[in-house]
Amino acid sequence: MAAQGFLLIASFLLILLVLAKPLGSGLARLIAAVPLPGVAGVERILWRTLGITDHEMNWRQYLLALLTLNLLGLGILFCLLFWQEWLPLNPQRLPGLSRDLALNTAVSFVTNTNWQAYSGESTLSYFSQMAGLTVQNFLSAATGIAVVFALIRAFTRQNVHTLGNAWQDLVRITLWILFPVALIIALFFIQQGVPQNLSAYQPITTLEGAKQLLPMGPVASQEAIKMLGTNGGGFFNANSSHPFENPTALTNLAQMLAIFLIPAALCFAFGEAAGDRRQGRALLWAMSFIFVVCVAVVMWAEVQGNPHLLAAGADSSVNMEGKETRFGVLASSLFAVVTTAASCGAVNAMHDSFTALGGMVPMWLMQIGEVVFGGVGSGLYGMLLFVLLAVFIAGLMIGRTPEYLGKKIDVREMKMTALAILVTPMLVLLGSALAMMTDAGRSAMLNPGPHGFSEVLYAVSSAANNNGSAFAGLSANSPFWNCLLAFCMFVGRFGVIIPVMAIAGSLVSKKVQPASQGTLATHGALFIGLLIGTVLLVGALTFIPALALGPVAEHFSLP
């Protein structure tokens, strides 16, 4: 099984790199504000029609544009969900959502989290899924990419105060990157058997004579952007373990590739935009190393399984609980790491049923800030925060002013970096503590002991880091949990974006300093190791005590 696991990981990464490199070149053109071939005339018509000027924005104007779009989207989505029963395309006549659930869901999809405290097929109409959730899947993904575009321009420009035009960036990202790639993926899903219709649910009679109602809907179109935009919210409650969302091994592979496609392509785009492809490759190597190690650990833990299974008379200790037989333990383990390394949150197996160590790794990947590939845009700007921290630490060790890509890193940048890195750990630890201190928080736990605490810690980690996956043993659809997680999702998203944009505004006005003999090379193996160490050190120091109370204690309770 070790050979199968190695081949699965190697083939996945190889296909990913082949697909990501050309997409990275296209993204680099958008970063440089150069229209893609053949669309310049279309863009001019769009700018005139939409009233978008060529005026570039400083970091405050750029941030204000993004916040305005997202807050407006939040309000519209809340209204769509709350008044769902009065809106069209609701063949099952599903009622509107409660205020707390509508708020939680609206915040969830606007922040690219896609945490779902409801069952899609029994709660949401087709109109809510299409006009509400799918639209936000595009816009939240475009927002993350726009932020990293602004940060990359801050490194590549000098002696200016502008970072581009947010409205032009959002339109270009949506029309020329997200929409065409999502369309290709959706057509592939339809060919593989994923439904795409507006039919009412279909009553059928099973082979045993039982009556069953099969849910229908525009699944393929939402599934495509759900994966490509690292959104993760499923059309159905079972998410990508549902045969209507993920019917075959091919769709399973395509979904994993779609999750990592843009995050990997952005690394290539960063190298091209910086004028040194080695810079992008260094980040890609660092991400890939952590990713491969995590996949290996989860695969090993799930193959070793639970010794209690053998004691109960099972043929094997391999942990197949909560996994689809059409995927198996290795593909399910790979999917779990992919979806939590990126801020996707889609699942093709139940993470709550993983072994203690197998479930701890996805949880830890979220807790370190979703920087191992990460979400579209958010993964790269999160990793660049760790890059700034790493060069600052290196500067302290060698007694030089830290700099990256020729830009000196001063006190202001380090304050904003520290703030951005500390936002999500504070939300996770304080939110988990609050949940464990209150009856409303503890009453949602369906399991006692360390595993029950792990469910709480996983939920808050997922919300604060905008992932959206869950240990399903937590009954989270209550006013307390809906409001707590909505707060964590909102602050975890925009509490990081704001300091990132402030860093971009500070760096873009600085002059690029020529490299000297004392300049730290940020593209070699030494720096890659330093960067990995920084990520691991921050994650370890912050979350080891909490993990020790949950998955670690659960692991050592086994014989």
UniProtKB/Swiss-Prot annotation:
Q: Which parts of the chain are coiled coil?
A: none
| TM region positions | 5-25, 27-47, 63-83, 132-152, 170-190, 253-273, 283-303, 327-347, 356-376, 379-399, 416-436, 484-504, 524-544
Cellular component, GO annotation: plasma membrane
Instruction: Give the molecular function GO annotations.
Output: P-type potassium transmembrane transporter activity; potassium ion binding
Q: Which UniProt keywords apply?
A: Cell inner membrane, Cell membrane, Ion transport, Membrane, Potassium, Potassium transport, Transmembrane, Transmembrane helix, Transport
Which cell locations does it reside in? Cell inner membrane
Quaternary structure note:
The system is composed of three essential subunits: KdpA, KdpB and KdpC.
Q: What does this protein do?
A: Part of the high-affinity ATP-driven potassium transport (or Kdp) system, which catalyzes the hydrolysis of ATP coupled with the electrogenic transport of potassium into the cytoplasm. This subunit binds the periplasmic potassium ions and delivers the ions to the membrane domain of KdpB through an intramembrane tunnel.
- What is the name listed in the Swiss-Prot or TrEMBL entry for this protein? Potassium-transporting ATPase potassium-binding subunit
Q: Which gene encodes it?
A: kdpA
